[in-house]
Amino acid sequence: MGLTRNFILWILLSSLFTAIQLTSSQRNTPPPRSKDADLCNGVFVSYTYLTGTKIKPNDTKNQPYRFESEITVLNNGRDELKSWQVFVKFAHREILVSATNAVLSDGSSLPASVENGTIFAGFPSADLKTAIMTAGDVTQMEARVELVGTQFGVAPPSVPLPKNITLVNDGWSCPKPTQQGSNVLQVCCTPNPNITTSKIGQKFLPRQEGDLTIMYDVTRAYQSSYSAQVTIENHNLLGRLDNWDLSFMWMKDEFLFSTKGAYPSVVDSSDCITGPQAKYYKDLDFSNVMSCARRPHIIDLPLTKYNDTNVGRIPYCCRNGTILPRSMDPEKSKSVFQIEVYKMPPDLNISSITPPQSWQIKGNLNPDYKCGPPLRVSSSQFPDTSGLPSNKSAFASWQVVCNITQPTPPKCCVSFSSYFNDSVIPCKTCACGGCSSDRVARTCSTTSPALPLPYQALLIPFDNRTKLTNAWAVLKNRKVPDPLPCGDNCGVSINWHLATDYRGGWTARVTLFNWGDTDFVDWFTAVELRNAAPGFQKAYSFNGSIIAVNGKNTTVLMEGLPGLNYLLAEKDGKNPSEDFRIPGKQQSVISFTKKLTPGIKVGSKDGFPTKVLFNGQECSLPSVLPTSNSHRKHVSTFLLILTPFLALLFLRI
């Protein structure tokens, strides 16, 4: 009896073990490789949809579904594929929750919306070797990226395939992908014949060009730590950064032990104390550790710290986070700082160094930058510190390339005015956003066009303009919408005023207003005048010059003269309880000749800019231009006398 019972128990356990094995194998078995992969003599890329299920909440109009997919990148070519990158054009409002063996090249952390498509970069193994160099070892030739995420609207058994998948590495050409069955999208990419094979197959990738580059140079390496120098360099003609904030993500539990030339925005070692770092480094005083955050934020030091022997004394450091374009000052177009990094097991050898991923950089009222993954490049060269006429190579170097993207919405706006119209065309309604909430929509109109203003309203904060704006509308017989249009919500506004237009030339007046709480040091503005720029003569209170942008001499660059390079923040009036706040202001008249621009139509269009940038950030422009008042000659004098009295009357009601 006992023997029979033991036998039955053994049968049950064996069945359970077999079932577990089968279930495990069913879940983990990768999809079989396509036969087309063997026919591809380049890089074979495929996207395979594996499974999907309905998830909460239940919503017939906007139902979410979990999806699991796999990206395969197989190098069947003759040359090693360095730092592979694959673009996937998702099409169903996908939210990516996890991805193995890859990171998002734009630095986004998961979960992340990828509905507009995204680029995957290989990590931790970024390079795919060839069959020739590995004797056909597929594990070194191939990368498999397992994706888990959420998509909307495609219920099983339908398959939410992306619209496109392609290799984006330089030097490769990919045709339109083909669909195999219902769940596979694949493409075979081959070397671009216009690029030599030697360039593709070289040991390191060539340094790339971009609006902003970041070099991560390892200068000293030890078993459990290393030192690195980070160089941020601006290459854009009109781009800049103010109060730059640089962040990245450690991938293997590294932590920031010390810094020179920059500083973490938050000094905190608590994540190490509660994490594996304190268990391994038992004798380390973590009170001296700079940051244990997985994504530390690094900021520049103030000028006063440049000669500080503890945190400063680094060339190109300590400038309050200001990086100017080379067109303004080449010496101030880069920032440099140094860090000391502690590693964790199992990477405790000198050669095991993993650069941080997901780089992001931003500034205060500056262009938005999108950064790619760090790419291994040839080691940087540094002058020998001993003074000998030789260079010293970095232990290893990686380059991060960042490019400017046009944000939506912008952060500055422009108003237009002219000598032939007594009203100002103001900045657009909601020009800089801030109008999406229901509360805002209930208090003002987000769609009504901004009301024309009298000139003196430009000096008054938007919230205090209501009475003056209404009075001006009544005076000009304009209908006042209810509710009134929302404000522009911009931290900086620029007024372009067409001042004169005569036979031999014309003049304009540019006024910059700072409505924010931060001073702008070494500010600049760039104005594109497509037809009028060749006639530029002089900016009387600014330093002005013509610069070539994209090969065209159509842009006037203006910056503050020595001693006038500060655009101060908004401040209280003399009597804060009664007076309006006062914006920081800079103003100059600029003159043009018509000798080089015959036939120019100054008043109708050519005298107004087609693009305006402030500190590298493109500003919102009005949709209409000032027009000539046919009756203005009869009433202008009367209005000039009456307007101040109306303003005074309505502002004191």
Curated annotation (Swiss-Prot):
The source organism is Arabidopsis thaliana (Mouse-ear cress)
**Residues bearing glycans:** 58, 116, 164, 194, 307, 320, 349, 391, 403, 421, 464, 543, 553
Source domain of life is Eukaryota
Could you tell me in which tissues this protein is expressed?
Expressed in roots, stems, leaves, flowers and siliques.
Q: List GO BP terms, alphabetically.
A: cellulose microfibril organization
Question: Which gene is transcribed and translated to give this protein?
Answer: COBL8
Q: Which family does it belong to?
A: Belongs to the COBRA family.
Name the InterPro entries on file.
Answer: COB_C, COBRA_pln
Q: How does it sit in the membrane?
A: Lipid-anchor; GPI-anchor
The protein's matches in PANTHER family, at most eight in alphabetical order, are given as:
COBRA-LIKE PROTEIN 7 (PTHR31052), COBRA-LIKE PROTEIN 8 (PTHR31052:SF18)
Give the protein's recorded name: COBRA-like protein 8
GO terms for cellular component: plasma membrane; side of membrane
Show the Pfam families listed in the entry: COB_C (PF25079), COBRA (PF04833)
**Lipidation positions, renumbered (GPI-anchor amidated asparagine):** 629
